[in-house]
């Protein structure tokens, strides 16, 4: 079982932040995973939307 360290909500769906990369203009490039672990994707996320420790 994976422990949630940080999450972000996009379009009313919660995603686990697996990894982060470069930051630019108050956004950070993140690797995100769905809570059930079936979807993994990359997206630019507003830093202020991330909840938890990254």
Model-assigned labels for residue ranges:
Residues 9-45:
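Basic/aromatic-rich interaction segments and small domains that mediate binding to polyanionic partners
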């Amino acid at each position: 079982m994976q422990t949630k360290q940080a999450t972000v909500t996009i379009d009313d769906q919660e995603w686990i932040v697996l990894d982060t990369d470069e930051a630019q203009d108050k956004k950070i490039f993140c690797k995100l995973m769905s809570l059930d672990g079936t979807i993994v994707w990359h997206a630019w996320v507003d830093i202020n939307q991330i909840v938890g420790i990254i």
